[in-house]
Amino acid sequence: MVAKILDGKQIAKDYRQGLQDQVEALKEKGFTPKLSVILVGNDGASQSYVRSKKKAAEKIGMISEIVHLEETATEEEVLNELNRLNNDDSVSGILVQVPLPKQVSEQKILEAINPEKDVDGFHPINIGKLYIDEQTFVPCTPLGIMEILKHADIDLEAKNAVVIGRSHIVGQPVSKLLLQKNASVTILHSRSKDMASYLKDADVIVSAVGKPSLVTKDVVKEGAVIIDVGNTPDENGKLKGDVDYDAVKEIAGAITPVPGGVGPLTITMVLNNTLLAEKMRRGIDS
């Protein structure tokens, strides 16, 4: 068996076309979604990622801006900028690029974002809504993972799903989304014992820990669906996933590549949530 390759680039392209159509429809009603991104410092990877978000937003007809603060910016300065965006009626969604410099509390900043503009879905109110099944902003990578599974017609009902990693960004929220689809979910982490026994029984594996080749062919059940969120650069700068891709694709039923799998959907879901934010504040049904 050779796995079906779940091409995130193509899935994202198709999804963004649908978003673009919705943006155009909103514009006809006099509303244009706007994404504001706060970037603190000069980290190269963060700058590149922020530019990608801005470009993607503008490509589908949104307005986007980067609010760039110096590496030495104080927590108060970041909060002041954030409050300005919170109170700016032209801004639909706000995103704060992390990591932040050590003098700025990431948690304090994320909690200061207006929950109705929190397109990353990291505000405690939005996290809480997710866990009681209320409409909210879902973190973008988990939302992208679910779109990949949906696009590939993966039936999750009563399936055994194993999530490796328990972060608030990916592991925990994607576990909740899988539960909503009636999968039986197991979360593995650094303290888990005998991980192989869980993986061998998994119909779906989502790995999001940043450990290259953690998931090997010998622990994957034939026909399993593999979602690889890992993106660790090797010594040559090439991105490596958590999964031994070349070996595992020979036995899996479907698999995401790295790069080109989950990554494109993460940015796409930032756009999705920005559109949702604009619709919600204008009282327009999604």
UniProtKB/Swiss-Prot annotation:
Which cysteines in this chain are paired by disulphide bridges?
Answer: none
Q: What GO CC terms are in its UniProt record?
A: cytosol
Q: State the source organism's domain of life.
A: Bacteria
Q: Does the keyword Amino-acid biosynthesis apply?
A: yes
Entry's Pfam families? THF_DHG_CYH (PF00763), THF_DHG_CYH_C (PF02882)
Keywords (A to Z) from UniProt: Amino-acid biosynthesis, Histidine biosynthesis, Hydrolase, Methionine biosynthesis, Multifunctional enzyme, NADP, One-carbon metabolism, Oxidoreductase, Purine biosynthesis
User: An example of a Gene Ontology BP annotation on this entry?
Assistant: methionine biosynthetic process
Its pathway is: One-carbon metabolism; tetrahydrofolate interconversion
According to UniProt, the reaction catalysed is: (6R)-5,10-methylene-5,6,7,8-tetrahydrofolate + NADP(+) = (6R)-5,10-methenyltetrahydrofolate + NADPH; (6R)-5,10-methenyltetrahydrofolate + H2O = (6R)-10-formyltetrahydrofolate + H(+)
InterPro entries linked to this entry: Aminoacid_DH-like_N_sf, NAD(P)-bd_dom_sf, THF_DH/CycHdrlase, THF_DH/CycHdrlase_cat_dom, THF_DH/CycHdrlase_NAD-bd_dom
**Chain positions recorded as NADP(+) binding sites:** 165-167, 190
Documented EC number(s): 1.5.1.5, 3.5.4.9
According to the UniProt entry, its GO molecular function terms are:
methenyltetrahydrofolate cyclohydrolase activity; methylenetetrahydrofolate dehydrogenase (NADP+) activity
Q: Write out the function statement from the record.
A: Catalyzes the oxidation of 5,10-methylenetetrahydrofolate to 5,10-methenyltetrahydrofolate and then the hydrolysis of 5,10-methenyltetrahydrofolate to 10-formyltetrahydrofolate.
Q: Which HAMAP family does the UniProt record give?
A: THF_DHG_CYH
State whether it acts alone or in a complex, and with which partners, per the record.
Answer: Homodimer.
Family designation:
Belongs to the tetrahydrofolate dehydrogenase/cyclohydrolase family.
What is the name attached to this protein's record?
Answer: Bifunctional protein FolD
Organism this protein belongs to? Staphylococcus aureus (strain JH9)
Name of the gene encoding the protein in the UniProt record: folD
